Design a protein with these regions (language model features):
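N-terminal phosphate-binding or glycine-rich loops at protein starts, especially the Walker A/P-loop
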Residues: 1-34
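Glycine-rich, highly charged phosphate/nucleotide-binding loops
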Residues: 52-75, 93-98
Length: 112
C-alpha cells in the first residue's frame, strides 16, 4: 500500500491523555502516513513510543510545528501533512491549536 506522505501528528497538550487517542493510534499503527514527529511541548525531547508504552519507536516528540518540520527534514522524511491527533472536549480546537494549523498551512502542509 502506498503511503499518502510523511506526517507530523498534532497533539499539543494531550499526547498522553484520553483526548490524544487518535495520536496514540497513529504512532502505534498508522499505515496511511510515515509518522515523522509528534507535536506536544509537554513531552518535547522524548520518543513518542517511550511516552506511550515505555518502548522507543523512533518518533520524536517536539515542541512546535516549525521544529517538527525541521526534525522531519533532518531525518530525510520531509513532512507533507499535519494530522490532527487530538479530540478535544466538544470537538472544537482551541485558539492556539487553530493558530498552529494556520502556521502548518502557511508552511504548505496538508492538514488532515
Amino acid at each position: 500500500m502506498k503511503l499518502d506522505g510523511n506526517a507530523i501528528v498534532y497533539c499539543e497538550g494531550a499526547f498522553n491523555t484520553l483526548n490524544g487517542k487518535t495520536a496514540h493510534g497513529l504512532v502505534r499503527f498508522c499505515r496511511r502516513y510515515a509518522i515523522a514527529a509528534v507535536m506536544d511541548s509537554r513531552y518535547s525531547g522524548r520518543d513518542a513510543g517511550d511516552v506511550l508504552d515505555g518502548k522507543a519507536g523512533g518518533i520524536p516528540v517536539v515542541d512546535a510545528i516549525e521544529t517538527a518540520k525541521q526534525t522531519a527534514e533532518n531525518a530525510g522524511m520531509p513532512a507533507t501533512h499535519l494530522v490532527i491527533g487530538i479530540a478535544p472536549d466538544g470537538g472544537r480546537l482551541g485558539k492556539s491549536a487553530r493558530q498552529d494549523v494556520i502556521r502548518a498551512i502557511d508552511m504548505n502542509l496538508n492538514v488532515d
